[in-house]
Amino acid sequence: MKVLAAMSGGVDSSVAAARMVDAGHEVVGVHMALSTAPGTLRTGSRGCCSKEDAADARRVADVLGIPFYVWDFAEKFKEDVINDFVSSYARGETPNPCVRCNQQIKFAALSARAVALGFDTVATGHYARLSGGRLRRAVDRDKDQSYVLAVLTAQQLRHAAFPIGDTPKRQIRAEAARRGLAVANKPDSHDICFIPSGNTKAFLGERIGVRRGVVVDADGVVLASHDGVHGFTIGQRRGLGIAGPGPNGRPRYVTAIDADTATVHVGDVTDLDVQTLTGRAPVFTAGAAPSGPVDCVVQVRAHGETVSAVAELIGDALFVQLHAPLRGVARGQTLVLYRPDPAGDEVLGSATIAGASGLSTGGNPGA
């Protein structure tokens, strides 16, 4: 089998490529260049897809004895990931750029080019498993990345391989060391790779500009002003510009964001509890959408808690009734549906959260 190994320069993708070589496949390593401008991606131990990472990936490919190339996806990454991220925040949403990158870059643009060049499979270092075409959680639940892969279609999964999903992270590092790979102890990447400073608010402010508005309480009383809704997210407590706590002496939290009027609503922490979710642009990883209500568990953050629920597709929208409340759910987040399974929870599908309702009348209008 002809395999394209997506090599980020980290330990996970390096071991994934090595395992595909061990399996006897014809393997070619590719590193995705996501920026041509210096300083626009995190470097070294704090990011991925930088020039240093490309060099690390090349050295691993040399050890493995496989061809290695760098493919330029900078413009598409800027358009489909960075610009989408900025636009989403301008709408008062809270997106996950890693989900978007997997959907539009790694398993759309990269996979499409690979298939066009005659490759059968794209292998990555994601912690997830495929069984009979079904996407499942990784053995290492602490590192499980099935959440950020739940946006993939059945067609995309047919050309995917996750060689390390059945192995705990600590064993992956040990294996890399045994293989003599210099990246064995390379730290994991964290945060958002295209925000070198780590200051998301400043990054967004430079691109969106000042759009002044107000912060109000549940009664509509103006408590503060702000320079843009992009500086807020649902559940935020600090940096609100408010002098003190609420009338009950408890801290205030962002409970809703109205980008049209540039109004940020704050309230009690209990106002953040939601029990129904609405999702747009649903994707079902097994291919066919469910024909009726389906029992599942729902996850709305990459490593967040799961809650039992019933989900149903009505028209183009996914409606989810939670059996227990989730706290601090924002529009733009990805909701992922799982089917509980002792062999590894199976991903049923995903959607982008378009709305949510809370336990009280009026709920959480900004979620």
UniProtKB/Swiss-Prot annotation:
GO terms for molecular function: ATP binding; tRNA binding; tRNA-uridine 2-sulfurtransferase activity. The record marks H126, Q333 as: Interaction with tRNA. Keywords: ATP-binding, Cytoplasm, Disulfide bond, Nucleotide-binding, RNA-binding, Transferase, tRNA processing, tRNA-binding. The gene is mnmA. Catalyzes the 2-thiolation of uridine at the wobble position (U34) of tRNA, leading to the formation of s(2)U34. The active site is at C101 (nucleophile), C193 (cysteine persulfide intermediate). It comes from Mycobacterium tuberculosis (strain ATCC 25177 / H37Ra). It catalyses: S-sulfanyl-L-cysteinyl-[protein] + uridine(34) in tRNA + AH2 + ATP = 2-thiouridine(34) in tRNA + L-cysteinyl-[protein] + A + AMP + diphosphate + H(+). GO terms for biological process: tRNA wobble position uridine thiolation. Belongs to the MnmA/TRMU family. This is tRNA-specific 2-thiouridylase MnmA.
